[in-house]
């Protein structure tokens, strides 16, 4: 099949002169190319197993955005969104073009977003066949041949074998993820990690969509039989994937969505799931994808003889990943869309053990907790001492939020008020004490709480206001002991509870100082208060 003229001319404009171009190859051909080029190996059942070392995760310190007049005052510059200048970008572009000369390239024309009113046409250019398959898994694939009228709104050039030189290229390492919004171009080099491709486009959508009144969200989403839609925000380890995977509800998507005036829609055509320690019992749907032709298993160890994957083996990394089309998961949406959310759930893992397991939020509280993006983790276990550490990631996705967080929070506030959306804080972390003393809230109890939210039960029960965090706690949840609902009552030492609550309140207050001048009085007053803590 001859290469379309619009692709040839675009490659020329990008200064790319490859030996050959493989355009929009489908899975079987990409498998052949990847295996012929020794880019991976087959696992039992059909997945393609690849390696990304030394980078087995994103490299946020190597991500830069070109700072020019058109975007300078619209981007939240800092450690997350590091600026670079156009001369540096253009120099890197030239060096990468030299690297690509005479090599084979793979091109995929796809879309980011299922809603045709807001979708972004993307062109993904890679030097690895498996990266082309990754892109085809993760983005929205065309129903038929790509029309000659296809014009990419953004282009990713991923030349993973190119290694940047920090002295010459203005980088911090051999890896480079450079974004030029004005030229609609992303350059990725020096890293084989597939997630850089998908997250670079997600960052672009986080810049572009607010201007169209669309709230980009780092969340999962599902839909009930009656068309009711729920959105789940949550950082790693909070249970976002587990709790949104419900056999009685249709999965819209597991990671990236937009909320427009038409409702919720998935940005992606696939999933990029963590694979460490999964079993048919713990994650049956996700485990099933590991036996499918077309799935990519990143950094998963396989038996050299049987080629059976060992998902418990973290020899390379704990961040083993699987990339697969969304339809490999049973009961997924056929059009990637849902209505306006009836419920928004913020999931947090509170290692302090002081947040209630479920509580309803006012719109102002929802904006406060959205801006905070709180979860917690255990800092260490030295000498048997486990100290919880508060972690905040604004909008539950700080690494990908290009604009000021208040832009996204204001959009969220507008939408939940306009559509009368109920918002909830669900703590999937500790109860009865902090990490090392208490225990994790039982998954069955958390599922019962989520079920009661989604079926409307919690909207009708009496509430009690938590005096510390100001949250509205349901007095009853079917299937959950009443004693579990009020965290102070689960502690053997109430004074110890108060002390840990003080620590978390202080952490919230310190973190929110960043946003105090950017939000109204109502949102500022929606956080926890030390004055109400007993003792």
UniProtKB/Swiss-Prot annotation:
Protein name as annotated: Phosphoenolpyruvate carboxykinase (ATP) 1
EC number of this enzyme: 4.1.1.49
Main location: cytoplasm
Gene3D superfamilies in alphabetical order: 3.90.228.20, Phosphoenolpyruvate Carboxykinase, domain 1 (3.40.449.10), Phosphoenolpyruvate Carboxykinase, domain 2 (2.170.8.10)
Binding residue positions for Mn(2+): 199, 218, 255
Alphabetical list of NCBIfam families matching this protein: pckA (TIGR00224), PRK09344.1-2 (NF006820), PRK09344.1-3 (NF006821)
Catalysed reactions, semicolon-separated: oxaloacetate + ATP = phosphoenolpyruvate + ADP + CO2
Entry-linked PROSITE patterns: PEPCK_ATP (PS00532)
Residue sites binding ATP per the record: 199, 218, 234-242, 283, 321, 440-441, 446
Residues binding substrate: 58, 193, 199, 321
Pathway per the UniProt entry: Carbohydrate biosynthesis; gluconeogenesis
Metal-binding found in the keyword field: yes
Keywords, comma-separated and alphabetical: ATP-binding, Cytoplasm, Decarboxylase, Gluconeogenesis, Lyase, Manganese, Metal-binding, Nucleotide-binding
Co-factor requirement: Mn(2+)
Location within or outside the cell: Cytoplasm
Cellular component terms per the entry's GO annotation: cytosol
GO biological process: gluconeogenesis
Pfam family, one: PEPCK_ATP
Top-level taxon: Bacteria
Function in brief: Involved in the gluconeogenesis. Catalyzes the conversion of oxaloacetate (OAA) to phosphoenolpyruvate (PEP) through direct phosphoryl transfer between the nucleoside triphosphate and OAA.
Cofactor, free-text remark: Binds 1 Mn(2+) ion per subunit.
Family statement: Belongs to the phosphoenolpyruvate carboxykinase (ATP) family.
Coiled coil location: none
Organism listed in the record: Salinibacter ruber (strain DSM 13855 / M31)
